[in-house]
Curated annotation (Swiss-Prot):
Belongs to the class-II aminoacyl-tRNA synthetase family. This is Histidine--tRNA ligase. It comes from Laribacter hongkongensis (strain HLHK9). It catalyses: tRNA(His) + L-histidine + ATP = L-histidyl-tRNA(His) + AMP + diphosphate + H(+). Its EC number is 6.1.1.21. Keywords: Aminoacyl-tRNA synthetase, ATP-binding, Cytoplasm, Ligase, Nucleotide-binding, Protein biosynthesis. Homodimer. Pfam families: HGTP_anticodon, tRNA-synt_His. The lineage of its organism: Bacteria, Pseudomonadati, Pseudomonadota, Betaproteobacteria, Neisseriales. One of its GO terms (cellular component) is cytoplasm. It comes from the Bacteria. It is an enzyme of class 6 (ligase). InterPro entries: aa-tRNA-synth_II, aa-tRNA-synth_II/BPL/LPL, Anticodon-bd, Anticodon-bd_dom_sf, His-tRNA-ligase, HisRS-like_core, HisRS/HisZ, HisRS_anticodon.
Length: 423
């Protein structure tokens, strides 16, 4: 026997026993996004490596340690499996000139790839739903996105288990002034910094504030705050955003250490977090990235978006027992005898045309075995077709869930009979 080949560590199969849960979540998401005017965009899972270096940032953890990068054997180009969805979406927007004299509200979903240590809620291949709102400069779109995510939690039934954290990263000049003060502060506490903090001190000092090291928490909490370096325009944007969030009744916590792990963010940033899943508590995160289109080779344009880890939301839904059971078929057709397979197949098609879901038994099996499979399928009824039913142009209807008696129904009446029983 050949050696069994298994899935790559951190890249998981989604099996039929759970795929219906994904379909449910995706269905809620699609309905929500349509309600807010978003259109679907689909981009390749492989992009040119410079796209991510230029957008995410060369000294970020993603680019330095987590990307799946390889060389194209045909032309020597460096290619990367996408670690996130924003860069590829904006590449497509710029390439196809989708912002010419208009704005765009786009959404995407699909697998992303990061080479990191697998753990609960964090995988090397993970699935993300993301949105990008492009061409909107004011804080109103920032607020609408918060409202939309809050609406999603309400539709899923998890509003009580997530909390919104917000911050502002200001503009480029304000971040530069804060960066200078932050480096000076960190240099005075270099003895407290761990190796990761020392590595980031001069390359990406803002990320030092995002440390999870308990020994660095007091130092990080006392560090200069970016909000204290905001100019009038950035402060007005932030205050306007907060006022709109408050006006629609959404509670939030200001977190001055919320900086996000990608270099393209500026102004508004946010995370929806939960304490129900242990250490990895972020279920949705995003922010504004004005100017990212210019970095990718397009004209400057304001933009904001978020990414949501689908596995983490599903873990939370499962933890709260909020995922639906698998929807069973309405009918399982049991057939036996000469002419029964064709008769059953025609019957199944008539029922499907009327909107019922039908499983027809295929192949040879005893009546007892077929009835056992019908019961295991979860179907509401077993329809029994044998030589006698074919001669009489009838169907035997056996309820499987409510204990009522079996009935014989004329073939011409079976659709209306079952429709009446389902009403």
């Amino acid at each position: 026997m050949a050696e069994k080949i298994q899935a790559i560590r951190g890249m998981n199969d989604i099996l039929p026993a759970e795929s219906h849960q994904w379909e449910y979540f995706e269905g809620v998401l699609r309905g929500l996004l349509a309600d807010y005017g978003y259109q679907n965009i689909r981009t390749p899972i492989v992009e040119s490596t410079p796209l991510f270096i230029r957008s995410i940032g060369e000294v970020t953890d993603i680019v330095e340690k987590e990307m799946y990068t390889f060389t194209d054997s045909l032309n020597g180009d460096s290619l990367t499996l996408r670690p996130e969805g924003t860069a590829g979406t904006l590449r497509a927007v710029v390439e196809h000139n989708l912002l010419y004299n208009t704005t765009q509200k786009l959404w995407y979903t699909g697998p992303m790839f990061r080479h990191e240590r697998p753990q609960k809620g964090r995988y090397r291949q993970f699935h993300q739903i993301g949105i990008e709102a492009l061409g909107f400069a004011g804080p109103d779109i920032d607020a609408e996105i918060i409202l939309m995510t809050a609406d999603l939690w309400k539709r899923l039934g998890i509003s009580d288990f997530v909390q919104l954290e917000i911050n502002t990263l200001g503009n480029k000049e304000e971040r530069a002034a804060h960066r200078e003060a932050l480096i000076k502060y960190l240099e005075g506490h270099v003895d407290i910094l761990d190796e990761d903090g020392k590595r980031r001190l001069y390359t990406n000092p803002l990320r030092v504030l995002d440390t999870k090291n308990p020994a660095m928490q007091d130092m990080a909490n006392q560090a200069p705050r970016l909000i204290d370096y905001l100019g009038a325009e950035s402060r007005a944007h932030y205050d306007g955003w907060k006022a709109m969030i408050e006006a629609v009744g959404i509670r939030y916590v200001e977190n001055p250490r919320l900086v996000r792990g990608l270099d393209y963010y500026n102004q508004s940033v946010f995370e929806w977090v939960t304490t129900e899943l242990g250490a990895q508590g972020t279920v949705c995160a995003g922010g504004r990235y004005d100017g990212l289109t210019e970095q990718i080779g397009g004209k400057p344009a304001p933009g904001i978006g978020f990414g949501m880890g689908m596995e983490r939301v599903l873990l939370l839904l499962a933890d709260k027992d909020l995922l639906p059971a698998r929807k069973a078929a309405d009918v399982y057709i049991v057939q036996q005898g000469e002419g029964a397979p064709v008769y059953a197949m025609q019957l199944a098609q008539d029922l499907r045309a009327a909107g019922l879901s039908v499983i027809q038994h295929l192949g040879e099996a005893s009546f007892k075995s077929q009835m056992k499979k019908a019961d295991q399928s979860g179907a509401r009824w077993a329809l029994v077709v044998g030589e006698n039913e074919i001669r009489q142009q009838q169907v035997a209807v056996k309820p499987l869930r409510d204990g009522t008696e079996q009935q014989t129904v004329a073939r011409t009446d079976i659709v209306s009979h079952l429709a009446g029983r389902m009403a």
